[in-house]
């Protein structure tokens, strides 16, 4: 898959996750991730989107170079799904504008090249998996 194919997954899957979170409520338990609530899923995806955005934005070649303050302030519950959507938009905008020639840091010993596609693929997968998890809270 190419970058645009991954980007075509991230935004809509995030929108579906946010809609499911709004429908289920942030306190709903998630059967496929025991001990987690919808709020936990929303915060997790929002955090990993921001982490990937920071890794690409700072052109880190080692994960230790990613600034530790990439999260900013966590959202109040009423703003959690808007915060989630905003993070996905920032991630996609960052990936779209990034240089494919740079070998960005990843957490794999031998990542595929170009490593920008690693981040796009990973975030598409992560978002999709947790969107499905969120839907399990509604019995889907």
What annotation goes with each model-predicted range?
Residues 1-4, 45-107, 139-140:
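Short, helix-capping/interhelical loops that line the mouth of catalytic, cofactor-
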Residues 10-14, 49, 88, 92-95, ...:
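Hydrophobic faces of stable alpha-helices that mediate helix-helix packing
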Residues 3-10, 34, 77-84, 120-123, ...:
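Hydrophobic packing residues in well-ordered alpha-helices of helical domains and bundles
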Residues 18-25, 96-99, 138:
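A structural signal for long alpha-helical coiled-coils and helix-turn connectors
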Residues 1-31:
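Non-cleavable N-terminal signal-anchor transmembrane helices
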Residues 23-66, 109-140:
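Short, contiguous alpha-helical
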């Amino acid at each position: 898959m190419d970058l645009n194919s991954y980007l075509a997954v991230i935004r809509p899957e995030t929108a579906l996750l946010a809609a499911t979170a709004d429908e289920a409520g942030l306190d709903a338990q998630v059967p496929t991730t025991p001990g987690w609530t919808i709020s936990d899923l929303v915060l997790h995806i929002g955090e990993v989107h921001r982490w990937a955005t920071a890794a690409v934005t700072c052109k880190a070649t080692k994960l230790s170079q990613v600034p530790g303050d990439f999260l900013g302030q966590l959202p109040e519950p009423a703003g959690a799904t808007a915060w989630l959507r905003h993070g996905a938009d920032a991630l996609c905008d960052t990936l779209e504008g990034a240089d494919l020639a740079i070998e960005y840091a990843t957490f794999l010993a031998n990542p595929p090249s170009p490593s920008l596609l690693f981040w796009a693929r990973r975030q598409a997968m992560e978002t999709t998996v947790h969107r499905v998890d969120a839907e399990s809270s509604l019995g889907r």
